[in-house]
Amino acid sequence: MMVTSSSIPIGQILYHDPFFFVKREIFYFFLIFLLSFILLRIPMSFWEKNSNLILIISIFLLTIVLLIGKSVHGSYRWINIGILHIQPAEICKISSFFYISNYLSRKTNEVRNNFWGFLKPITIIIIQSVLLLAEPDLGTVIVLFLTTLSVLFLSGVKIKQFFIIIFFVTLIITALVLFEPYRIKRILSFWNPWKDPFGNGYQLTQSLIALGRGHFFGQGLGNSIQKLNYLPEAHSDFIFSIIGEELGYIGCFLILLMIFFISFRAMYIGQQSFEKKQVFSGFLACSIGLWFSFQTLINIGAVTGILPTKGLTLPLISYGGSSLIVNLMAICILLRIDFEIRLSEHQAFPKGI
């Protein structure tokens, strides 16, 4: 609904078809809908056994996109295969969490008691991060590190090791910002977007105007002014601004409530998995919940001016084929984990009892 409303003007301008983007979104939705019948029948043991292979494939795609990828706004993030536009960074997220969950399910004691055991999964994330930064895609790198560190923390890593990694990651991110002029401009415009409202601060000021126009109940669905080619990426990274303008703060609250309900539900499913000794599923469910939470917080932070812009979509809401497919794939996996929990409870009781 919101993709339709926010993408009509840009679809008309770029493709002379106001419903261009929503048609593509519907296509991707039906694609994952058909795939869901397969995904829901794949046991978690399959993902656990093949997590390393999936990780290798994602790293291969991250490498290929730098060679043959399509450039959009100076970033090489998409591989075009016919009508499909694949974004390897989205695949990288879920593949990383497969790997981390598998690693922790096998080597929890090593991670807790040995610094090298703790460093191994971090090394894999660093390799992926180097490829992601070459695109460049700092937003995905931040989500990967935040989620990975949080899952490692849940696994019982020593606080000392945890803070050592946080310290070095902070130094690296600071260096990445300082050595890239466009990132410095983003930081400066984030601090005071109104100082340059028609330059570096343009996108943020237009976003804030959209949110300000919405007030509590919004201007009404379809009545946004900012989507009329004023706010860049109104249908993708900044769709939350259009939600605020059209549906008001009430609409924003309901959207956040929905996303965080899914996140907390994922964490609860993870807890149940641990209780049933399904360790891989437990770590994976927690990873998905944390991933959705962190990406949502970063997106909302960028839209409202609390954080610099990172180019991250709002999970399950923003336009984006790869993002939608991977997010719904994660939902299917959560449903499968929940199914296996219920199945184990049913099998725990003999018939007639």
UniProtKB/Swiss-Prot annotation:
Alphabetized InterPro entries for the sequence: Cell_cycle_FtsW-rel_CS (IPR018365), FtsW (IPR013437), FtsW/RodA (IPR001182)
Segments passing through the bilayer: 26-46, 53-73, 115-135, 137-157, 162-182, 242-262, 288-308, 314-334
Membrane topology: Multi-pass membrane protein
Organism ancestry: Bacteria, Pseudomonadati, Pseudomonadota, Gammaproteobacteria, Enterobacterales
Protein localization: Cell inner membrane
Membership in a protein family: Belongs to the SEDS family. FtsW subfamily.
Molecular function per GO: lipid-linked peptidoglycan transporter activity; peptidoglycan glycosyltransferase activity
NCBIfam families (UniProt xref): ftsW, PRK10774.1
PROSITE patterns found in the cross-reference section: FTSW_RODA_SPOVE
Alphabetical keyword list: Cell cycle, Cell division, Cell inner membrane, Cell membrane, Cell shape, Cell wall biogenesis/degradation, Glycosyltransferase, Membrane, Peptidoglycan synthesis, Transferase, Transmembrane, Transmembrane helix
GO cellular component, one term: cell division site
Gene that encodes the chain: ftsW
The enzyme's E.C. designation: 2.4.99.28
Pfam family, one: FTSW_RODA_SPOVE
Domain of life, per lineage: Bacteria
GO process terms (BP): cell wall organization; FtsZ-dependent cytokinesis; peptidoglycan biosynthetic process; regulation of cell shape
Protein name per its UniProtKB record: Probable peptidoglycan glycosyltransferase FtsW
Catalytic activity: [GlcNAc-(1->4)-Mur2Ac(oyl-L-Ala-gamma-D-Glu-L-Lys-D-Ala-D-Ala)](n)-di-trans,octa-cis-undecaprenyl diphosphate + beta-D-GlcNAc-(1->4)-Mur2Ac(oyl-L-Ala-gamma-D-Glu-L-Lys-D-Ala-D-Ala)-di-trans,octa-cis-undecaprenyl diphosphate = [GlcNAc-(1->4)-Mur2Ac(oyl-L-Ala-gamma-D-Glu-L-Lys-D-Ala-D-Ala)](n+1)-di-trans,octa-cis-undecaprenyl diphosphate + di-trans,octa-cis-undecaprenyl diphosphate + H(+)
